[in-house]
Design a protein with these regions (language model features):
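Membrane-embedded beta-strand positions in outer-membrane beta-barrel channels/transporters
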Residues: 60, 64, 83-84, 156-158, ...
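Flexible loop/turn segments at secondary-structure boundaries
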Residues: 22-24, 70-72, 94-97, 103-108, ...
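Beta-propeller domains
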Residues: 178-181, 185-187, 197-259, 278
Length: 369
């Protein structure tokens, strides 16, 4: 209750609740959902009458101290840590979170992975500070990977919220201490996200890493938009990103972009998209990108039977065609055709069938040779 943002005046809240009965493959919701439309969040009900609520000041803090016993080469040391976490509700729209000299020693460790690929492993984020209130940053996809803020974190702070006019703002800043491998570094991530009618939005995001001394600095800027038509039957997506890497001797600039259009309602739906990354685009200083220098074009066509008929309770079928090539060299990489069918029978048994087909041999330019 003390952490919920209550406005001063009466404001309708969007709300929906759902229950899944697994044995019947059925979902029930408080507010009716038209399954012919993909965006369920736009079909929430309205909760009215929330007014005259006087919550306490949204302020909480948690100091902590920890000590460890470490034994190595017949020597035992007792390193210790201390710090504080703070959360403050600036107003009804925005919240400030801060952590000073955090200790993540109680966070579950990562599972061991035998990685034989040419790319690094992307691990799940388990630290609470980087999981709460960071949903807006996910719109940047490869631009932000919180596990980059890993080595000896000195402090972190973030401000998140959305104004009454639908402008979402999220700012995160963190400083990591100097280690034997890396210098002192400052990380900054910022996003502005304006909600539009019919679930549309336009966003501007920037990530920045500044390191002490002559080490490389990096900056990535991206603009993202999704426009839904009035009937929410079609969606149009556009993205443009620019990366910059610079030190005292070099300056590298790269670009990436995406265009997509899709039919998002009805029995027949489709997605048509094109993704381009040049050979100099690199978001890995703050984000996570497996590889650049790629062109990916794809088409997905789906048929979905929503109403029960004589044979099936529901049925879906899709075919996807994806073509990949290198951007700079204009060389073929792969052509994949994927078929997928899924049906729920009258006895509630669900059957699925999936098949992949590559008419040409795939050429992996990253494999060890």
């Amino acid at each position: 209750f003390s952490q919920i943002r209550f406005p001063d005046n009466n404001q309708p809240w969007a709300l929906n609740m759902a229950r899944t009965i697994r044995r019947y493959r059925e979902d029930y919701s408080w507010n009716p959902i038209n399954v012919k439309y993909n965006d369920f969040s736009l079909q929430a009900g309205l909760l009215n009458g929330i007014k005259n609520v006087n919550p306490p000041i949204r302020l909480s803090f948690m100091p902590y101290a920890s000590i460890y016993a470490e034994s190595y080469d017949k020597q035992t040391t007792f390193p210790y840590n201390y710090g504080i976490d703070l959360k403050y509700g600036i107003n009804e729209s925005f919240t400030l979170d801060m952590t000073l000299i955090p200790d993540f020693g109680q966070v579950a460790s990562d599972a061991m992975v035998l990685n034989l690929s040419p790319f690094e492993v992307k691990y799940e984020e388990k630290r609470q500070f980087f999981n709460e209130g960071t949903e807006l940053f996910n719109k940047g996809r490869d631009m932000f990977y919180s596990r980059r803020l890993q080595d000896d974190l000195l402090n972190g702070s973030k401000i998140t919220g959305r104004t009454k006019n639908g402008l979402g703002i999220a700012i995160l800043n963190a400083i990591t201490n100097e280690t034997e491998e890396n210098p002192l570094a400052n990380y900054n991530i910022m996003i502005l996200d304006q909600s539009l009618d019919n679930g549309s939005f336009i966003s501007l995001m920037n990530t920045n890493k500044m390191q002490n001394g002559d080490s490389k600095n990096a900056n990535v800027t991206g603009i993202f938009s999704r426009i839904n038509n009035k009937e929410n039957s079609h969606a149009y997506v556009a993205e443009l990103k620019m990366s910059q890497e610079f030190d005292k001797d070099n300056y590298i600039k790269g670009y990436a972009g995406k265009l997509a259009v899709g039919k998002t309602s009805g029995n027949y739906q489709y997605d048509l998209y094109s993704i381009i990354e040049d050979d100099k685009y690199n978001s890995n200083d703050v984000g996570f990108l497996y590889s650049n220098n790629e062109i990916t074009n794809g088409l997905v066509v789906r048929y979905q039977q929503f109403n029960e008929n004589k044979r099936f309770i529901n049925f879906s079928s899709s075919v996807a065609v994806v073509h990949q090539s290198l951007f700079t060299e204009q060389k073929f990489v792969d052509l994949e055709i994927e078929f997928e069918n899924r049906a729920t029978l009258k006895n509630y048994t669900t059957i699925s069938l999936k098949a992949d087909f590559n008419p040409y041999e795939k050429y992996d330019y990253y494999e060890a040779r």
